[in-house]
Each structure stands twice: as structure tokens, then as C-alpha cells.
A protein has these predicted regions:
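Alpha-helical transmembrane segments of multi-pass membrane proteins
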Residues: 1-281
Length: 281
């Protein structure tokens, strides 16, 4: 493929080849009772992840060059193969395949959303930050709900609600702190309004998702109830304090003309007055 296909079409072609190969293997494995062939089907998402890393760049568009069709085909084959081969695969391999597939699906969708949000701006502003976090945060919100979801979540609740969600929760918490500190909150063409702007609404959405998942997920990981309560409340409190502090600085930047640089913000009387009021509350 790398030799005969032009570079812009290589990733889509590789994904289709992988999907077709695994579909054939998943079809033959139960008929031939070939356990090793069934196990090879679990390599679909890791190999697709390698293709994604090979194709990725700052303006990567997963849906380009019929990528939308290639990725849709790959994920359809992935879930079909796992359902067809469930009785033939070792429990550990089956569990890992579900978790890796979940991460890959969210990653591809997040990259596509990020690309679409890039069209809203020319600078690295709040829209680009939101592209990374909205879908993983929405997933955490959904997994925190007590309702029963259809297959595969219903059949493998620990894989989707706990094993796949725990690293995402840590990732979203890290994203919260990084975006809160680094981003000045520009979201052209929208004007900046404290707490009512895309960045800070997105930060609250991500933090709420982490908190909602942690209330149930930490117990599934074996964390004691009292310790879990202290941990979630402590992290949420510290994060909200950091958000309000940065909100004051962003407000001074947009409304008071203070450069969004640490030295300038700390030296600003406007920032100091705003922090005094917010911290007193």
C-alpha cells in the first residue's frame, strides 16, 4: 500500500485493508475453530492506532479522502468481530480489545471535531482547546449514568464504565488544568463573558464529567467511600478555585487590556482587586 498508493490516500487505504483482513479472519475463525486466528482479530485497533499516528499532523482531518468511510468500516468490523468471537477469545484479550477500541473511537471523533472547530478560528484559541475534550467528557457523563446501555456496554460494563473511563477522567482533569492556565479564552466571533464563554463552559463541562464519573468509578476501582468522597471534593474544590482565579485574569485581559502574561497579570492592580473580591467570596 505504501508503495503503490499516493500519500494522501494511504491511511484510508490501509484502514480498509485492515478492516477487510480482520473481517475475513473473524468469519473463518469460528468455522475452522482456529483460536490463533481469532486472537489476531484483536490486533485491529492497535494497528489502526499505528495508522492514525502515521497520518496525524496538526491539521489532520480523519474524514478526508473517504476517511469517514474507512473509519466507519473499521469500527463496524471491530465490534462485529468482537461479538462474533466472544466465546472463542481469552477473557483478557477480549477485555483489552474493547477498551482499546473505545479509546480509538473517541480519539478519532475528537480529532474530527477538533478539525471542524479549527474552521472557526485562525489562532490557537478556545475553539481548538474544546475540540480535544467535548467528546471524551460527554462519554464520561454517559458512563456515569446508572441506566443500562445497549451492547457492548451492557455486556462489558467494567471495560467501558471503569477501565476505559478511568484514564479518560485523568486525561480530562489534566486538560482542564492545562487549558485553564494556558488559554486566554478568545473565541471569535463571540465576545468574552466571564463563565459564559466557550472555554469556561467547556471547562465546567469537563470538570463536571470527571466529578460525576468519579463518584461511581472510584468505588469500582476499590477506593473506600470516605476516601473517595474526600478526594473528589478536594479535586473539584481546587479546580473550581483555579477556574475562578483564571477567570478574573481572563476578564482583566479582555475587558481591561492587560496582556495575558503571568508577570503582567500579577502586576495589574485590576487583577489584584478582582482576585481580592473573588477570593473573599
Amino acid at each position: 500500500v505504501l508503495r503503490f498508493v499516493t500519500p494522501e490516500w494511504q491511511s484510508s487505504t490501509l484502514l480498509v485493508v485492515l478492516a477487510a483482513s480482520v473481517a475475513l479472519a473473524a468469519f473463518l475463525a469460528p468455522r475452522t475453530r482456529w483460536a490463533e486466528l481469532a486472537l489476531l482479530c484483536c490486533l485491529l485497533t492497535p494497528l489502526a492506532g499505528v495508522v492514525l499516528l502515521h497520518a496525524w499532523h496538526l491539521h489532520y482531518h480523519p474524514a478526508a479522502q473517504f476517511g469517514w468511510l474507512a473509519w466507519a468500516l473499521l469500527f463496524a468490523v471491530h465490534f462485529w468481530a468482537l461479538r462474533r468471537l466472544a466465546a472463542q477469545l481469552p477473557a483478557g484479550a477480549l477485555s483489552a480489545a474493547h477498551v482499546l477500541g473505545c479509546w480509538l473511537l473517541l480519539g478519532v471523533l475528537a480529532l474530527e471535531l477538533r478539525y471542524l472547530l479549527l474552521a472557526l478560528s485562525e489562532h490557537y484559541n478556545a475553539w481548538r482547546w474544546l475540540g480535544w475534550a467535548l467528546l471524551p467528557s460527554a462519554y464520561l457523563w454517559l458512563m456515569a449514568l446508572p441506566r443500562r446501555w445497549p451492547w457492548p456496554v451492557a455486556a462489558y460494563p467494567r471495560e467501558y464504565r471503569v477501565l476505559a473511563s478511568a484514564p479518560l477522567a485523568l486525561l480530562m482533569l489534566g486538560w482542564f488544568w492545562l487549558a485553564n492556565v494556558v488559554s486566554a479564552g478568545e473565541a471569535e466571533p463571540l465576545a468574552y463573558l466571564p463563565l459564559l464563554n466557550p472555554l469556561e463552559l467547556g471547562l465546567l463541562f469537563a470538570l463536571g464529567a470527571v466529578f460525576a464519573w468519579a463518584r461511581l468509578g472510584l468505588a469500582e476501582l476499590g477506593v473506600e467511600s470516605l476516601r473517595s468522597q474526600w478526594l473528589t471534593q478536594g479535586v473539584a474544590g481546587a479546580s473550581l478555585f483555579a477556574l475562578l482565579t483564571a477567570m478574573v485574569m481572563r476578564t482583566a485581559h479582555h475587558w481591561g487590556g492587560v496582556p495575558y502574561q503571568l508577570d503582567a497579570l500579577l502586576d495589574s492592580m485590576l487583577v489584584q482587586a478582582g482576585l481580592s473580591i473573588v477570593w473573599t467570596l
